[in-house]
A protein has these predicted regions:
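Non-transmembrane "mature" sequence context
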Residues: 1-91
Length: 91
């Protein structure tokens, strides 16, 4: 079940996998701003989706309960749901 959120230290380890993709490009700065400066989530989304990141965060995702990833950012439960989904995605 998607609601089974991983411990925070596991999420932090997952974020580290994508840090090398983050170079503070203009595209990445815009993505980060769109995600309310949630750098961890931005790094993972960019690491997985690269130039499709902006389109993806605005897309309705069935796995998230038919909401957009961008709508999960400021809600604790939805943010955990998004993080869990991201850990199940691959590059």
């Amino acid at each position: 079940m998607l609601e089974e959120y991983y411990e925070n230290n596991l999420w932090e380890d997952y974020v580290k996998l994508y840090e090398s993709f983050w170079i503070d490009s203009e595209y990445q700065k815009i993505l980060l701003n769109s995600l309310n400066n949630k750098i961890d989530i931005a790094k993972v989304i960019y690491g997985i989706l690269e130039k499709d990141s902006h389109r993806w965060i605005e897309k309705i995702i069935p796995t998230l309960g038919n909401i957009r990833p961008i709508d999960c950012i400021d809600d604790e439960i939805l943010s955990k749901r998004l993080k869990t989904m991201l850990t199940r995605m691959s590059r």
